[in-house]
Amino acid sequence: MSLSQNAIFKSQTGEENLMSSNHRDSESITDVCSNEDLPEVELVNLLEEQLPQYKLRVDSLFLYENQDWSQSSHQQQDASETLSPVLAEETFRYMILGTDRVEQMTKTYNDIDMVTHLLAERDRDLELAARIGQALLKRNHVLSEQNESLEEQLGQAFDQVNQLQHELSKKEELLRIVSIASEESETDSSCSTPLRFNESFSLSQGLLQLDMMHEKLKELEEENMALRSKACHIKTETFTYEEKEQKLINDCVNELRETNAQMSRMTEELSGKSDELLRYQEEISSLLSQIVDLQHKLKEHVIEKEELRLHLQASKDAQRQLTMELHELQDRNMECLGMLHESQEEIKELRNKAGPSAHLCFSQAYGVFAGESLAAEIEGTMRKKLSLDEESVFKQKAQQKRVFDTVKVANDTRGRSVTFPVLLPIPGSNRSSVIMTAKPFESGVQQTEDKTLPNQGSSTEVPGNSHPRDPPGLPEDSDLATALHRLSLRRQNYLSEKQFFAEEWERKLQILAEQEEEVSSCEALTENLASFCTDQSETTELGSAGCLRGFMPEKLQIVKPLEGSQTLHHWQQLAQPNLGTILDPRPGVITKGFTQMPKDAVYHISDLEEDEEVGITFQVQQPLQLEQKPAPPPPVTGIFLPPMTSAGGPVSVATSNPGKCLSFTNSTFTFTTCRILHPSDITQVTPSSGFPSLSCGSSAGSASNTAVNSPAASYRLSIGESITNRRDSTITFSSTRSLAKLLQERGISAKVYHSPASENPLLQLRPKALATPSTPPNSPSQSPCSSPVPFEPRVHVSENFLASRPAETFLQEMYGLRPSRAPPDVGQLKMNLVDRLKRLGIARVVKTPVPRENGKSREAEMGLQKPDSAVYLNSGGSLLGGLRRNQSLPVMMGSFGAPVCTTSPKMGILKED
């Protein structure tokens, strides 16, 4: 037993030596005896993965040759102390080294993470093996301690047995000695001889010792056999324990391998689960982003839905409001039609009483003046007016109303036949004698139809004129043929629609017959609406007797057809809306009381750059020498007075018309005609007042109201009864509707321009005032004199009137140029004038005219005005700011009381040539 333990300890010591010498594989033969020359025990250590195998060599014949097998307990205790825990730990660490991890590391040496993982697993396995080895070492240590204690007990038992054997042998010897002594005494008593007794005693004692030695030998042999059997049993038990320990270690290693394999599989599964988890997280993040986007879209759709709902509600409200306004306008339209019906009936009655008055148009050539002169026409007209009684006055009014009816029907027909109105000159005169002396700006258009449009109206007078002239600007034969063809087409269109108008008028009369009670409360407006009546029979008669009057004039250019006068045609050309050059001097046009501006012209930064900053100059042909005859007799001179009726009595000629001597002067009375759209409707005719007078209040509080001293004023007395469109936002205080009246009722004021002509002492006596229209003769109320209204001029205005649409339109008509811009659409033309003026920044001053007493009439307010006054309308923001893109021209006929000029910072001071 002690030998095997010593061999194990020797082998472990040899393994430690081998490990300390660079782990060389070798065999170590260790003798268990003290003699090194006797290799009885050979220990062979196989450096393998398993535990070292030990081979014990013993002599089978003699069993052993020396007594070293039995060692003392002290030596065994010393041998047990040679095993240290460090040696045992190193031994176990060396034993758990295997090749499995080496193979794995060689397979995965390229993967750093896997190698690190295997190294970590190896460290954990080594730690586990070390802990198991430590546990086994502790168990082995306990077993070795138990073995040592058992060996000590066995030695003590051997000592006790030896001691007992020695005592037993001593006792046996004593017993033998006692027995021998007793036998000898017995023999002595039998009288034997002493010699023989002594020999026998020595012999028996020798035999007894021999027997004792044999017995002792047998006992020792038996004891040796028992010890040998016990040693073999201990050896077998040791081998059994070693086998169990090896099996346990193998089981631990196998379990470790299985555990490592399971851990590797679990690691792979964990990596797969981690990848799947990452994929799930990405899917979750994408789904969350989609959810956020869908929520954002949902919010946007909700907001859009709310906005659409609000828009729908606003549209419904606007539709309801427009429906209500439409019903209201329909009611007012029916009311106006009723009043129109009554007015037409009244006009028919007056016309039946008056009788034919066609001779007025042809009596103008029998005066003292030339047949084609304007003075002769005016003289004949005034003579007929003075010779007519009250019945002739009614006939004249009826005829003039028929003229307006003709123009109304022609305008309506042309408005339906032409989508966009072509700007034409006012017809009713002979060939044009107007020559353009300068072009203020270039519109960038080609002069393809030179002087075609201004002469379309004059071409209609060729058959009835026996003295045709050939002034500059005469159109060619092709242009005349084109103009005649256009006029014939328009005439045919008008005749084709005559029947439709008649049927439509009959239907309206039937509708208006039911509303006579409602119309009875609007008698004042009935007379104002009389000019809208459309008598088809009278229109046909007048169209046939007017020398090709089938020509449909421009909308709102309402003039009476005066035939055969160069001066009248020049008036019509001057009536075109070119207010930008109204301050420029013209040959043949003398403006009394007007002084020229200084030579040093003042320019502004806001003015547009032009080649020549001069206005459009007209050259008017001088009248014949027949017009410069001596003054007519006093009864003839009175024909220049229009028939005025006032409550205070007739107005004297000398006081009311100081500048009546027209035959001795070359004065030309200019009617500035323009056309403006009604703020609410473009489809209805909106004629302005024929002769709006200016009520100018003086500093002393007195007003000097004068009548019109124009030669053509006698033809225009009834034009003041024109009608303006009614709309729900306009309060009608009078039937006379001029541009100044319309702007004032809309709250738009104009600033009075202080021209250099105001330095004249005669002109300085007149205060600054605005043009306030007065009521017509048939109006029950009259408008008072308005006080000067403050005006706030616009700032940052960079537009010039010469670049505006009316000026360009005038140049197109005079030069026959093509328009440089595309014609505006109907939606743009329907824009309200008031909205345009408001958009341009015109100062808004709400001033409502106060109606006067009912006892007065317009003739009482008006008187003959001084001819030394001129009308100047600038292109500032007050009047023409909203007309620059409007090609329709409102009619403004008559003479104003004072030189009222509107100005703006953009026009500056015009330079004179």
Curated annotation (Swiss-Prot):
Present in heart and brain (at protein level). InterPro entries: HAP1_N (IPR006933), Intracell_Traff-Reg (IPR051946), TRAK1/2_C (IPR022154). One of its GO terms (biological process) is vesicle transport along microtubule. Residues 134-355, 502-519 form a coiled coil. It comes from the Eukaryota. The keyword Transferase does not apply. One of its GO terms (cellular component) is early endosome. Keywords: Coiled coil, Cytoplasm, Endosome, Glycoprotein, Mitochondrion, Transport. Pfam families: HAP1_N, Milton. One of its GO terms (molecular function) is kinesin binding. Residues 359-507 are annotated as: Interaction with HGS. Residues 11-21, 453-463 have a biased composition (Polar residues). Residues 688-704, 780-789 have a biased composition (Low complexity). Belongs to the milton family. May regulate endosome-to-lysosome trafficking of membrane cargo, including EGFR. This is Trafficking kinesin-binding protein 2. It comes from Rattus norvegicus.
